[in-house]
Curated annotation (Swiss-Prot):
Temperature-related behavior of activity: Optimum temperature is 60 degrees Celsius. Very thermostable as still has 98% of its activity after incubation for 30 minutes at 50 degrees Celsius.
Source organism: Ensifer adhaerens (Sinorhizobium morelense)
InterPro entries, alphabetized: Aliph_Amidase/BUP, C-N_Hydrolase, C-N_Hydrolase_sf
Lineage: Bacteria, Pseudomonadati, Pseudomonadota, Alphaproteobacteria, Hyphomicrobiales
Domain CN hydrolase, chain residue ranges per copy: 5-276
Protein's UniProt name: N-carbamoyl-D-amino acid hydrolase
DNA-binding recorded as keyword: no
Gene Ontology molecular function: any one: N-carbamoyl-D-amino acid hydrolase activity
pH dependence, entry free text: Optimum pH is 7.0. Stable at pH 6.5-8.2.
Length: 304
């Protein structure tokens, strides 16, 4: 018997800086319910799904900065999303800004979680490949201060059993790094999912702007194919606080084929029928890691 499921992506349109978490959760609940009505077993939501993409601003007030982070998950405002997921029997992946205090020291991470059908958190990932810069740069029309507001993740690239599937996570820039995909592929991930907030304009290299969508889809398709895994990417998209964010949220098959793609720059749900056993086609006949890999020649990747 093949293992079948319906996988969904819940793309978010812009979130205004003034928009409250309560308002955002209502939007997420609508997409969760819509996905479940289409028979989805699991839905992927974007990076930093509860707020606007705040690293585009330079904050000097720590209290204002802290207001964008979650200190518990789920907190009272977010809990209805978990309760509705349990009621509908649909799992989800979702990103948020995490603030923890350890030894009296604040630690901030760009975090993603996996939630199963009963509404329980079964996996956590903290973004490792942080893009952007740490100090204010006046020439930019908007900042990209992830290196200032987050520290690199400390959980590696784990793979979790979520209901019937083995799942791993990326967050935004991670999808561009083949090392992230390969670690999860070696750990047997059948679905690799995550969210992104990707500006269509990159101030340091504006000559690449016309390639933004191409590079996004190239990363997703190559990562899926080279690791024999399904993948799903959920974007926060459209004109958000004078910054245009890339659309093209997608679901990709282990063959590298795009099987679902958003067409709008607003809240949108896409779904695809997923056969998890198709991962074996690639892993047994093309990318058979045990049979063909030669790790003794790859040492330089980890040394430099």
């Amino acid at each position: 018997m093949t293992r079948q499921m319906i996988l969904a992506v819940g793309q978010q349109g812009p979130i205004a800086r003034a928009e409250t978490r309560e308002q955002v959760v209502v939007r997420l609940l609508y997409m969760l319910t819509k996905a479940a009505s289409r028979g989805a077993n699991f839905i992927v939501f974007p990076e930093l799904a509860f707020t606007t993409f705040f690293p585009r601003w330079h904050f000097t007030d720590e209290a204002e900065l802290d207001s964008f982070y979650e200190t518990e998950m789920p907190g009272p405002v977010v809990r209805p999303l978990f309760e509705k997921a349990a009621e509908l029997g649909i799992g989800f992946n979702l990103g948020y800004a995490e603030l923890v205090v350890e030894g009296g020291v604040k630690r901030r991470f760009n975090t993603s979680i996996l939630v199963d059908k009963p509404g329980k958190i079964v996996g956590k990932y903290r973004k490792i490949h942080l893009p952007g810069h740490k100090e204010y740069e006046a020439y930019r029309p908007f900042q990209h201060l992830e290196k200032r507001y987050f520290e690199p993740g400390d959980l590696g690239f784990p793979v979790y059993d979520v209901d019937a599937a083995k799942m791993g996570m990326f967050i935004c820039n991670d999808r561009r790094w083949p090392e992230a995909w390969r670690v999860m592929g070696l750990r047997g991930a059948e679905i690799i999912c995550g969210g992104y907030n990707t500006p269509t304009h990159n101030p340091p290299v504006p000559q690449h702007d016309h390639l933004t969508s191409f590079h996004h889809l190239l990363s997703m398709q190559a990562g899926s194919y080279q690791n024999g895994a399904w993948s799903a990417a959920a974007g926060k998209v459209g004109m958000e606080e004078n910054c245009m964010l890339l659309g093209h949220s997608c679901i990709v098959a282990p063959t590298g084929e795009i099987v679902a793609l958003t067409t709008t720059l607003e809240d949108e749900v896409i779904t695809a029928a997923v056969c998890l056993d198709r991962c074996r086609e690639l892993r047994e006949h093309i990318f058979n890691f045990k049979q063909h890999r030669q790790p003794q020649h790859y040492g330089l990747i980890a040394e430099l």
